[in-house]
């Protein structure tokens, strides 16, 4: 194999185009990630990308996720609306019927936000509920899919900080 001499490297560098940070992000989708963006991307069947939700949030709400990917929890409905979702927060004491396929009786999907990390440094994390079961002592455990880490898990309903009912305005898209 031929070895490149150091003299050729400057020539190669001159010939290669250099992208600035904004061009690079647009080209490879390098925007800051957020579990909320990833959940909506997953729920819309890849109609829009997580990068689309990032761009809409930055343009419409004027901010980016923080270094941990967190967005303002009060903006979850607005962010989902950018992608054509009706999003409603489930209030304390409010109930809904969740079928075994993870949808409500009205065809909505459920997005849960729960705390992760140590008590002194908790961050929120959003996942999509995919089902549930009741324990022997009548506690509800949700199965979830995490589009950010591409894994599944389970969590007690009591450990969820917020639940959102999510339905796409045009389910045929």
Annotated model-derived regions:
Residues 15-17, 23-25, 43, 110, ...:
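Intrinsically disordered, low-complexity regions of eukaryotic proteins
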Residues 22, 34, 124:
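Short, well-structured alpha-helical interface segments that form or flank functional binding sites
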Residues 44-48, 53-172:
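Conserved active-site-adjacent core of cysteine acyl-enzyme catalytic domains
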Residues 1-30, 85:
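N-terminal secretory leader/proregion of peptide precursors and effectors
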Residues 31-34, 70-71:
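Soluble non-cytosolic domains of exported or imported proteins
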